């Protein structure tokens, strides 16, 4: 692909990303206001704690229409089985979408933690652009070649985001991990129970996770994200934020060695045994040591 053509395609990607986040926010909120989208559609592959409901289809339908409208050659991988989106011919790009992060909460009537996330990758599987929409607050997180940004649509503002520089696990850190499901919570506490007894009194455990969390890492809201058995479908749509921010996102082996996490097309239903995302290498290494030596 020639340079000018590449710029043109990247511009289309950026446009689709903003259109998607804007339209998905509006349509999901509209359906939520009517109490729609709670019909159960099925289970999620390798995710006994999760379920697919009607609201999950909204984002997928919007994105499919947009990529076809802009005549993009792309394949986008989604969380539910058989819901990948293909447009055009041989893909020039790949995508990963989490159409609605907060399904279980929405189904149970909680107006809390509703997000949608979307990332695009080049043919070499490198992140090009990522976006997260905070549906309830009408805020959009964007990661592109210019950096990471937060757009507050109600206030009409756009600010640049920067990560934390915390390096010491014994300090006043903010660690995110998904604790709402017992199967994940047990593994986290198995690794961190002893350390937690000596946590700094102002240490904060943010009990949420998923594809949106990487925008929080890029914004300095959290210092690290730790997950055991993390589904790739919860990483791919958002981890580009962390990479753009210079944060570390690694998959950890049983012996403590690790590799940079990489998007792999078609593997969204696989899991990572231990995923650590941290704002600094020093904090990453301390977390890995704690997990391996548990």
Regions found by a protein language model. Name each.
Residues 50-51, 179, 200-201, 224-226:
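Short, contiguous strand/loop micro-motifs
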Residues 94-96, 130, 225:
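Short glycine-aspartate micro-motif
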Residues 1-39, 71, 194-198, 206, ...:
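Oxyanion/phosphate-interacting regions
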Residues 56, 60, 188-193, 238:
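Short, highly selective alpha-helical patches that border small-molecule cofactor pockets
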Residues 81, 100, 135-136, 230:
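An acidic- and aromatic-residue-enriched active-site/binding cleft used to recognize and process polar
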Residues 113, 117-214, 266-294:
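Acidic beta-strand-loop-alpha-helix segment within the catalytic core
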Residues 41-126:
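Flexible, acidic active-site loops/lids enriched in D/E/S/T/G that coordinate Mg2+ and/or position polar
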